[in-house]
Amino acid sequence: KQLLLDLALPAGGLNSIITSADAPLLQLLQALIAGQRYEPSLYLWGDVGVGKTHWLRASADSARAEGWQAYYIDAATQSLDDPLYEVANWLAIDNLHTLDDAGQFEFFALYNQQRQQGGVILSSGAVHCQQLPVRADIITRLQWGLQFPLSPLTEADTLAALKWHAHMRG
């Protein structure tokens, strides 16, 4: 009987992002991570399958590789109440549309703390921030930052992504 080895491949950071439609977002994230630009808040939104989670994980991986205290947090499955997040300067918080009352309180506190400390919060949700089922003060905070609707991959981008992942697997 052959046993499977659960060996995860490195995520690839922002190098794993294949996009033509969302190239301005990629360039902005690269500039933020390199310290060439500062934006305290970015909100990504779109339907299931447009890559929100991939964008957030890739940004956190790239930021961490460049010396940021960066964390990816899935608000659908993880609490935002972790002391590590208070010392972070890059938070990638996925699935804001799933925040319950306690999660909204924690997000609001983290958002204000990051802004005060000069950190970055990259967050995502299924809908535009004005349509999120969250408190009005959270919507206001998200509107202070940049907002990006993500586009589905084109056929050419999908092919390029498949080739990149095949190449990474060897």
Which positions does each model-derived feature cover?
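Pre-Walker A adenine-sensing motif
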Residues: A23-G35
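Post-Walker A helix-loop "phosphate-sensing" segment adjacent to the P-loop in P-loop NTPases
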Residues: D61-I73
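Dynamic helix-loop-helix/coil hinge segments at AAA+ ATPase domain boundaries and subdomain interfaces
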Residues: L4-L26
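Short regulatory helix/loop adjacent to the ATP-binding pocket of P-loop NTPases
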Residues: C129-Q143
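Conserved AAA+ ATPase "sensor/coupling" helix adjacent to the nucleotide-binding pocket
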Residues: G145, A160-G170
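Conserved AAA+ ATPase "SRH/arginine-finger" region at the nucleotide-binding site
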Residues: G145-D157
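Walker A/P-loop nucleotide-binding motif
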Residues: R37-L56
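Conserved nucleotide-sensing/catalytic segment adjacent to the nucleotide-binding pocket
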Residues: D82-G125
